[in-house]
A protein has these predicted regions:
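Carbohydrate-binding surfaces of carbohydrate-active enzymes
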Residues: 254-261, 274, 288-290, 294, ...
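Aromatic-lined substrate-binding rim segments of carbohydrate-active enzymes
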Residues: 48-129, 292-293, 297, 546
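Short, acidic/polar
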Residues: 42-57, 313-324, 384-392, 529
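Hydrophobic faces of well-ordered beta-strands that scaffold small-molecule active sites
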Residues: 34-36, 63-65, 104-108, 186-190, ...
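N-terminal carbohydrate-binding accessory modules
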Residues: 1-62
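Conserved, mostly hydrophobic/aromatic
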Residues: 28, 55, 63, 97, ...
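The substrate-binding groove and active-site-proximal loops of carbohydrate-active enzymes
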Residues: 33-45, 69-88, 145-166, 218-220, ...
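Polysaccharide-binding and catalytic clefts of secreted carbohydrate-active enzymes
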Residues: 126-322
């Protein structure tokens, strides 16, 4: 059950605000989720109105702001919220936004980052041993961050949650009167980029005593009995004489079980314990967000939808969107990318997964942070990078975004509005983009993806536990376009192939084959299996030889409905925890072809070529190669918007078959027009740019 379904079964949203596919419905009116970030506490209060007017002039409908705990706290449990310091008067800031017709997305943390020292947490919290995450050796877990490193909090720590709840209680009396319909706040974000503060290696953390207790409860709930757990792990019973006396408690009671501290698997079934630990991290984060959400409600901040933002590289972190969706209403992504071919592929992969999940849940695919500028310790991101990223994300299914940052502030370079509310040239692009989205009714359009590449959660957990670079986050490798092949150990555990690598290679081979022919597809996470497979004509499932029975059943059901199912590069001989199957899967339920193995790139190319004809798949091929096209349709199925993406450093003329997209197109940003000749639409493309074209 998702958070939205849970609300539907109870009192739901009590303030006439709810999420819908096109955005956020407020008192019956659908408002597209187009927002801009403004940090009031970093600006002169006398400039707030000018800054917010400039945000509205860019065509944005909401203002997004953090409410930093450390900035407002003057003593434990006591906040300064404008009584003596006008710069911290959140009420006045929100009321100005309301006067201007802007709604507010409030982000009270407790973790906010925002390039603040300690990520916006009070210094007393991060240096409190009871609040600190713990390493396997029970040391604080340090984050090497500018201006200096600090110990990160534990998402399991009761002391930390008690302190966060006290902060919310102090904040509640000021924020509650600002909630819609009495004020402009219509959306709350819970925490921020909750990837364990970027110390997200499988064996980095969290060995805090409260986390160990929660881990044992997680195992007890999952297995029910210690005998079931012992059977799963292949652990002998005490009377079999094979267990050292020092460890016999571990096989007789949950309360004595300790988590793994390093990867020590020697055979496939040894992985079960490690995969459980990786899954526990996902459970820990979802549980923490749920606790924080309940603390907000207890402080009077209730009746509104909630969000959480996943950081770049989220697929390599313990953030499991399918689980986070059970405790918050909208899971979005943060985008900070360069304009280049690698980023284009990453954006396509991330956004297609987000869009497919969001569509299935009837919520908008939302970028909680769409980078406009960069912090000074980041690789520079210029205006071309920002324009490329947002247009590319829209091309692959994004339906709303928050311009981060809309207004300049300290520790940020390149926002479209300066700190006095004066628009810079970059603001013109965002204003034109907002107008283009409104003109086309883009929030109501849909990009169809009849092909789904399914990545079982087992594969992502396996890549985490087999990560080869210690505390250097797997997310870093994902951000730069590297996969399991570049970051995982090549152990085969006796199976004769590198266990964590080949499924990733398989998925990427199909991505490349599909894109070469312009076939629209989406990536789907394995735990979205119950919501994101229904309308697919072709399911491609990557597996290293392990598959959950529940996932196999979903694939078989899809096959029974008429979809084609392709699995590979290995036959699934294990369940999702690499335990031998008691009864082998009946692969005949998936079709007659069997697993696709052998020369995967060649086989993928042949399979795609065959499927285009046999499954009547759309193909928006574009000449020359390396140029990508996506099409967005209205409710009647008519193509309305065409994106042409040139991630290369070449100035080229892209040629698109006009049969699928019409004979005339106009660029919604620079007003260029194009007309098909001899059945081909020719579009001039500058290097590393994206065109958004209205079709006629």
């Amino acid at each position: 059950m998702t958070a939205r379904e849970d609300r539907a079964g109870g009192e739901g949203f009590g303030r006439r605000v709810r999420l819908v596919p096109g955005g956020i419905e407020i008192a019956g009116d659908v408002v597209p989720l187009l927002a801009g970030s403004v940090h009031y506490w970093r600006l002169d209060p006398n400039e707030w109105r000018a800054c917010l007017e400039a945000v509205k002039a860019m065509g944005l409908r909401l203002v997004d702001t953090y409410i930093p705990w450390a900035v407002h706290e003057v003593a434990p449990g006591k906040l300064e919220l404008g009584a003596s310091d006008p710069q911290r008067d959140i009420t006045r800031f929100c009321r100005i936004a309301e006067e201007l017709g802007l709604y507010v997305i409030a982000r009270p943390g407790p973790h906010i980052n925002a390039e603040l020292t300690y990520f916006g947490l009070p210094e007393r919290i991060v240096w409190d041993p009871a609040c600190q995450a713990r390493s396997p050796d029970q040391n604080p877990v340090m984050l090497p961050m500018l201006p200096f490193a600090f110990p990160v909090p534990s998402y399991a720590s009761d002391a930390f949650h008690d302190e966060a709840a006290r902060y919310f209680q102090a904040l509640g009396p000021v924020l509650t009167p600002l909630l819609y319909p009495n004020g402009p706040i219509v959306l709350f974000q819970i925490d921020n980029e909750g990837a364990l503060y970027f110390r997200d290696g499988a064996y980095d953390q969290d060995y805090h005593p409260d986390a160990i207790r929660l881990y044992r409860e997680f195992l007890r709930e999952k297995y029910g009995t210690i005998d079931a757990l012992r059977a799963s792990y292949g652990t002998p019973t005490p009377d079999e004489g094979e267990v050292p006396s020092s460890r016999r408690g571990e096989v007789t009671r949950f309360s004595a079980i300790d988590p793994p501290r390093k990867l020590d698997a020697e055979r496939p079934r040894d992985l079960a314990r490690h995969l459980d630990w990786s899954e526990f991290h996902e459970h820990l984060l979802a549980t923490a967000f749920q606790r924080l959400g309940r603390a907000l409600v207890a402080a009077g901040m209730d009746g509104l939808p909630t969000t959480h933002n996943l950081p770049p590289g989220q697929d390599a972190t313990p953030l499991n969107a399918a689980r986070v969706t059970k405790v918050v209403d909208l899971v979005g992504l943060d985008y900070y990318h360069m304009a280049d071919p690698t980023s284009r592929a990453i954006i396509a992969r991330r956004t297609s997964e987000l869009a497919t999940r969001s569509e299935a849940l009837s919520v908008p695919a939302f970028a909680c942070e769409m980078g406009a500028g960069f912090p000074p310790f980041f690789p520079p991101l210029d205006e071309r990078d920002g324009a490329f990223t947002v247009l590319c994300a829209l091309a692959y299914g994004l339906r709303g975004f928050n311009v981060y940052m809309a207004v300049e502030r300290d520790r940020w370079i390149g926002a479209p509005i300066d700190r006095h509310g004066r628009a810079r040239p970059y603001a013109v692009f965002w204003r034109k983009l907002s107008a283009a989205l409104e003109q086309t009714g883009f929030h109501e359009l849909r990009r169809k993806t009849p092909v789904r590449i399914l990545i079982p959660r087992t594969e992502r957990r396996l890549a985490r536990v087999m990560h080869a670079f210690g505390p250097l986050s797997g997310a870093f490798f994902s951000i730069v376009g590297a996969g399991a092949r570049e970051r995982c150990v090549e152990d085969d555990l006796g199976l004769g192939y590198p266990l964590a690598i080949e499924a990733d290679n398989f998925a990427r081979a199909f991505e490349q084959a599909l894109e070469a022919r312009g076939v629209p597809f989406a990536v789907v996470g394995g735990e979205d299996r119950d919501i994101a497979l229904g309308d697919a004509r072709w399911l491609i499932c990557a597996t290293s030889g392990a598959l959950k029975p529940e996932l196999f059943d979903r694939l078989a059901e899809a096959r029974a409905r008429g979809a084609r199912v392709t699995i590979g590069p290995h036959e699934p001989r294990f369940d999702g925890a690499f335990r031998p199957l008691s009864v082998p899967f009946d692969l005949g339920r998936l079709g007659e072809d069997g697993p696709l193995t052998g020369d995967v790139p060649a086989a993928a190319d042949a399979a795609v070529s065959n499927a285009i004809g046999s499954l009547d798949l759309p193909a928006y091929a574009c000449d020359p190669g390396g140029i990508y096209v996506t099409v967005h349709e209205d409710a009647a199925g008519a193509p309305r918007v065409l994106f042409v993406v040139n991630p290369s450093d070449r100035d080229i003329v892209a040629r698109v078959s006009a049969g699928a997209v019409g004979t005339k197109a106009s660029d919604l940003i620079d007003d260029s027009t194009f007309e098909a000749r001899a059945g081909t639409l020719e579009v001039r493309m500058k290097p590393r740019t994206v065109r958004m074209l209205a079709l006629r």
